[in-house]
Amino acid sequence: MNHTKSSFIKLALECQVLKFGEFTLKSGRISPYFFNAGLFYHGDSLRKLGQFYAKTLLEQEVSFEHLFGPAYKGIPLATATAVALAELGRDITVTFNRKEVKTHGEGGQLIGSPLTGRTVIIDDVITAGTAFRESQTLIKENGGILRGVIIALDRCERGLTEKSTLSEIREQGIEVYSIINLFDLIEFLKNDNQYEQVQKLESYQERYGA
């Protein structure tokens, strides 16, 4: 496992963003782990999080000049990543949306840069894909070109059908990048001799894996 992935998992554990136990998901499934990027709320952890996203984008050589952060979790992610990219000499622009259209002041649904050019959607995880589809529509309506999606964790899990939402996105010709995926997490736990957790995650993946 490379240093970036292991360092990200350690940060997620330290901030209790990543937890192990029994968690009931919206789908009704009982998951042995849970990931909540909303718990990256300290300035230093947000700074590091932005660096992880930025490094992943650069390592994957993604061709883009614009980040779109879906409300609400995507907003700090886009901001932190844009700052991290600027520190690495890559100046990109940021846009995010409002949940409700504003009818006064500057009005509209979008805040930040005009949503044009080669754009990457940034989020923490993608499950049902609702936020992705809304973002995809906004980008298209405003003249942008969707070049990819980056998330923190790919659960490698199918949805209510045999396919995962990420598989359906990829079938549209849209690349999906992640800082880590479930198999990285399993490898990390094996290296840390946490075999009980490994067994639970492998059983879950065998049952629900995409």
Swiss-Prot record:
UniProt similarity note: Belongs to the purine/pyrimidine phosphoribosyltransferase family. PyrE subfamily.
Q: Which cofactor does it need?
A: Mg(2+)
Origin organism is: Legionella pneumophila subsp. pneumophila (strain Philadelphia 1 / ATCC 33152 / DSM 7513)
Name the InterPro entries on file.
OPRT (IPR023031), Or_phspho_trans_dom (IPR004467), PRibTrfase_dom (IPR000836), PRTase-like (IPR029057)
Function according to Swiss-Prot or TrEMBL: Catalyzes the transfer of a ribosyl phosphate group from 5-phosphoribose 1-diphosphate to orotate, leading to the formation of orotidine monophosphate (OMP).
Q: Which GO terms describe its molecular function?
A: magnesium ion binding; orotate phosphoribosyltransferase activity
EC code(s) of this entry: 2.4.2.10
Q: Which residues of this UniProt protein bind orotate? A: 34-35, 127, 155
Which PANTHER family has this protein been placed in?
A: OROTATE PHOSPHORIBOSYLTRANSFERASE 1-RELATED
Q: Which reaction does it catalyse?
A: orotidine 5'-phosphate + diphosphate = orotate + 5-phospho-alpha-D-ribose 1-diphosphate
Q: Which residues bind 5-phospho-alpha-D-ribose 1-diphosphate?
A: 26, 72-73, 98-99, 102, 104, 123-131
SUPFAM superfamilies assigned:
PRTase-like
Which residue ranges does UniProt annotate as crossing the membrane?
none
Instruction: Extract the Gene3D superfamilies matched here.
Output: 3.40.50.2020
Keywords in UniProt for this one?
Glycosyltransferase, Magnesium, Pyrimidine biosynthesis, Transferase
PROSITE patterns, A to Z: PUR_PYR_PR_TRANSFER
UniProt-recorded name of the protein = Orotate phosphoribosyltransferase
List the GO cellular component terms: cytoplasm
Involved pathway(s): Pyrimidine metabolism; UMP biosynthesis via de novo pathway; UMP from orotate: step 1/2
An example GO BP is: 'de novo' pyrimidine nucleobase biosynthetic process
Q: How does it assemble?
A: Homodimer.
